[in-house]
Every structure is written in structure tokens, then in C-alpha cells.
Amino acid sequence: MSSQKKVSSGNTTPSGLAGLASPLNDQQINLLQQISDLSPQQLAWVSGYFWGLSQSAAPSAVTPIAQAVSAVAAKPAGKLTIIFASQTGNAKGVAEALEQEAKAEGIAVQLFDASDYKGKNLANETHVIIVASTNGEGEAPDNAIELHEFLQSKKAPKLPNLQYGVIGLGDSSYEFFCQTGKDFDSYLAKLGATPFIERVDCDVDYDASAAQWRKQALEKVKDALSAGVEADVVQLPVAQLAAGHALYTKQKPYAATLLTSQKITGRDSGKDVRHVEIDLAGSGITYQPGDALGVWFENSGELANQVLAKVGLSGVESVDVDGESLSIHSALVSKFEITSSNPQQVEKFAQLSGSKKLLKLVEEKDKLREYAGNTQLVDLLAEKQTKLTAEELVGLLRRLTPRLYSIASSQTEVDEEVHLTVGLVEYDVKGEKRFGGASGYLAQRLEEGEQVKVFVENNNNFKLPADDNVPVIMVGPGTGIAPFRSFIQERDNRGAEGKNWLFFGDRTFTQDFLYQVEWQKYLKSGLLTKLDVAFSRDQAEKVYVQQRILENAAQVWQWIQEGAYLYVCGDANRMAKDVHQAFVAVAEQEGKMSRGDAEEFINDLRKAKRYQRDVY
């Protein structure tokens, strides 16, 4: 692992040395001036460091520079260390908000990406907060795999002096809800650390619960972790502390313009996949290949009417949402999730309706999760006709959350645009069509020229290698092809010399070969070194991308030995697992390893960020 580094630091005015009686020579003063732009919190930390040196050394050994720094920042202070384990950026966003709020309270704080934090350093900490999302089936996010494993190992230090807090982010629709947060809580406790606040497990609509927990956590540590700078400490407002962060965020999205939503699957395809282009002109928004675009959407007004009819409401009834009075119809369209359900929602409605079917289902957790994952709200309400008040209906609902789409373009190619590859979620329930919320909005309801609220979600866990000479292997069936379109555009415009190999799969060659003309162009030019496709329904026996990887095992292994980076994007439940096992099989077969050693080899590639996944 590279040397530990901070993600960010505070912004404040430099502290001058004028007026200090200096025992330093000119060279030492010049050196000291290099710390003049540190924030009060950073100066407090430096002060503590030199104070520690002065306590461990004889009085005559105390250096003049330590004396000078102590004059600038009078006393040492404790600090709050925040570590985020994030896959898509949500945990990072919560951690950054916590960092800003801590600074506003005068608390010395430092923020780390989990991949940049050395676990052994926990022994030197006094107060740590871990913000953790969960990936796949209870797995740690890619950036936290090493820390997660370290804390379970025999190398992990005892932590009797550490106080900690954990906030988990997840989706209660899944079995392993907030599992990574639960893991970190358990591991730290077993190592002797003490929680200063109870862990919170936040659901999909986490903003309010996360904000409340952050406030409570800072109240508990504020007295112990004041900044410790007695003179000229300026308390900056949160808005100033956030300087340098993105102009547009989840909370403050940009009103972009839809340029086009074009179907790119064939007329006879069983899928409706759209190439979506959005205009960002004048916004100043930038993004990198591998990032995601957050899209805020509105629900279908027609679907809202169907929901209201199921519970006996007209739509004009008023409800209060964040202090704003809205009609229940408007609230369903713009404020709440109505194209999905979740286990808690099913349980609440079972109790309200008295449905025997649902009450029995609630007792069987696996079946409950499966039902909730495949049932829209309107179909849940149809299980038993039940009259509800507007407030009771709202009490069933989650807040609307934006959807994240892997960006399918590079700004080196498209400038002030962003492209997406959107698969329309579409299915029948008892003869009635059901559509996904965001995909239905982008593919059907939003007209060209209309505005759509968006923001960029950086994904540092899915990035091209910095060295343009490094080969890359990309596996992206279906709409998982999206980020690789951005990768290839980027490498093309950078003049990258590294080899590029794409594995793509879908149902049929004639109807579902997404961006076929572009891939053939890149293949002809030589930018795309190799293209292997798997169309599952073009022959009697289905073929998938993992089989193509195994068929090319010797060459895949050769590329890996040449330093190739591996990228996988798409379905997490089956495809990503099967592709992972294919890579393990390649290492076992071609590397002449045991199965266990092959697993370890592939996992080591992940830790080294040579094997990156964007799966969902």
C-alpha cells in the first residue's frame, strides 16, 4: 500500500510569524514558513507532534523549530479520525459532511479513504468514526477490503484506548443489510475498543438518519476534541469549509437538458435499451471515466393515480413534507418511492390491512425479501383493498432517492455532455405494464429539451490505470458496457498505447449488440486490440462472457502477467460472481496454482486496484 495520505484538509488564512521573538536562523525560518498555510486544526496536530518530541527529549534537545510552532499553536489537541468505506460514493459523502460539521464545531479532524488508511495506526488513535457501505452480498467495498481483512487478522493491534463510532449504509431489502458496518463494529469491539455512540444502520433514504447520528456523535466528542488553538482560531461556516467540493451535489443537483433518448436495441429485441445524451453546457461540471451520474426523477402521474385509487384517496388531500404542504398526488410524483417496495413497507401494510397472506409472509424473511424485491407499491396495495388516510399512506413510503448510472462517455470526446446507457425496466403484472422509476422517466416520460436534475458521483474504485501503456481487460455484458465506452474514448483521445480487450455479451447479435458500429470502428483502428462476444440465445446452448474468458485463458493470463488491469461492470448477483470464478480458474489453470492460492492471487489484484468492479 502506498504511504498514508489525507483526503482533504481545512481551508483557512495563514498564520503569520510576525512579532515572535525568534531563536531561529534564516534557513530555519524559511523552512518554518512552509507551514504558514496550515489550518488551525492542522497546526494543532503539528503542535502536538512537536510537544511530544519536547516531552521525550532533554530540555537542551528541544529544537528551535518546535518552540516556534508551539508559539503559533499553543497546546496539543486530540483529533477525530474519519474513515470511509465506500463503493458508489454515498459513504464518502456522509463522511465528508461529518468532516465539515466537525470543523465547524472546532474539532480537529482528518478524513481517510479506507484504502489509504493503515490499520495498525488505530493503536495511536483516540477517536475514530467509520462510515461504511456494503457491497454485494455483505462484502466490504473494494476500497475497504484490506482494512476489513486486517482487523480480522492476528496482526490487528489491541485497542483499549480507542473510542469509536460506526455508521452503516445499506438497503434493508437485502439479506446482508449494512453488514460491513456491523463487521467493523464487531471487529473493533473484539480488539478492546469502546463505542462512544451506538452504531446506526441507515437505509436507502439515509439523509435524515445519518444527519441526526452525525449531530449526536459530534456532541459526544466535542469536549474531548476541541481544536486546542488558543489564539486566532476562526470558526468557518460549513459552506466555506466545503470550498473545492463539487458545485452540484445530490442535495443540490444541476438542472441539465435532455438532448436525446435513442433506442439502440433492435425492433425485435426483448429489451429496450436507450442511449441517453444530456447537455451540461455552462455548468462547469466535470467527470472522469468510471464515475456515475446521479439522476433525480419524477414518478408517473398515472401510476400515482393508481396508487391513490387503491387506498381510496382523491389526490387533493394535503400532506406535510419537510415543512411544505403538498397534495398527496404531487408528493407521490416528486417526493416518494412508488415503483418499488421493501420488507418494512410490506410488514407495515400487512398490519394496516390485516391481510392473512402478507402477515404469513412477514414471518418468512427470505420469502418476504423476495416478494418485496419483485413487487411494486401498487401491486402490494392490491393484495387487500384498504382505505388509508394520506398520512397513513405517506407513513408506508420511503423518500425518493436518485438513481446512479455508469457514465458512458469521456469529456475528452463529448466535451460538455454526458452520455448514459439506460435499460428500461419493464414487465407485466396480471396484464398490466410496470416500469422502473428512473428508467421509465428517461426512456418514456422525459421529452427532448426538457430539464433533468443531475449530479456526478465520483467513483475512485473504478478508474483507468494512470499509465497509458498498461493493458486493460474489460468485461461488460448488457448495459454494463457503459463505462467501457468512456474508457475507450478516453484512451483514444489520450493517445494511450496500452492494449484493450473487451468481453461483451447479451441475448442476440442482431438485436442486442450495443454500440456495435463503434466497437467495430475501434477494432479496425487497432485501439481495441481484441473483442470477444457471447450472445446467449444465438445457439441452442447458452453462452456467457465467463465462458469466453475461460476459452481465452492462456491469453488472459499472459495479459495479467504483463500487468493488465481487470474491470467488470454489470449484474452483481450472477454475472460478476461467475466472472470472478472464471478469473480464479484462469489463475489456477495457467498459473499452476491451487484453488486457494488462485483465490488469493485474484484478491491480491483487487487490493492492488488491478481488479476493479462496478456491479449492481
UniProtKB/Swiss-Prot annotation:
Q: Which cofactor does it need?
A: FAD; FMN
Q: Name one GO molecular function term.
A: sulfite reductase (NADPH) activity
Q: Which residues form the FAD-binding FR-type domain?
A: 251-465
Residues that coordinate or bind FAD: 339, 373, 403-406, 421-423, 427, 436-439, 616
Membrane-crossing segments per the record = none
- Look up the record and name the pathway of this protein: Sulfur metabolism; hydrogen sulfide biosynthesis; hydrogen sulfide from sulfite (NADPH route): step 1/1
**What does the entry comment about cofactor binding?**
Binds 1 FAD per subunit. Binds 1 FMN per subunit.
Which keywords does the record carry? Amino-acid biosynthesis, Cysteine biosynthesis, Electron transport, FAD, Flavoprotein, FMN, NADP, Oxidoreductase, Transport
* One biological process term in Gene Ontology: hydrogen sulfide biosynthetic process
Q: SUPFAM superfamilies annotated for this entry?
A: Ferredoxin reductase-like, C-terminal NADP-linked domain, Flavoproteins, Riboflavin synthase domain-like
Cite the binding residues for NADP(+): S536, R537, K542, V543, Y544, V545, Q546, D578
Residue ranges of every copy of the Flavodoxin-like domain listed in the record: 80-218
Question: What PANTHER family does this protein's entry cite?
Answer: NADPH OXIDOREDUCTASE A, NITRIC OXIDE SYNTHASE-RELATED
Q: What does this protein do?
A: Component of the sulfite reductase complex that catalyzes the 6-electron reduction of sulfite to sulfide. This is one of several activities required for the biosynthesis of L-cysteine from sulfate. The flavoprotein component catalyzes the electron flow from NADPH -> FAD -> FMN to the hemoprotein component.
Family that this chain belongs to: Belongs to the NADPH-dependent sulphite reductase flavoprotein subunit CysJ family.
Q: Which NCBIfam families match?
A: cysJ
HAMAP family from the xrefs? CysJ
Record protein name field: Sulfite reductase [NADPH] flavoprotein alpha-component
Which species?
Answer: Vibrio vulnificus (strain YJ016)
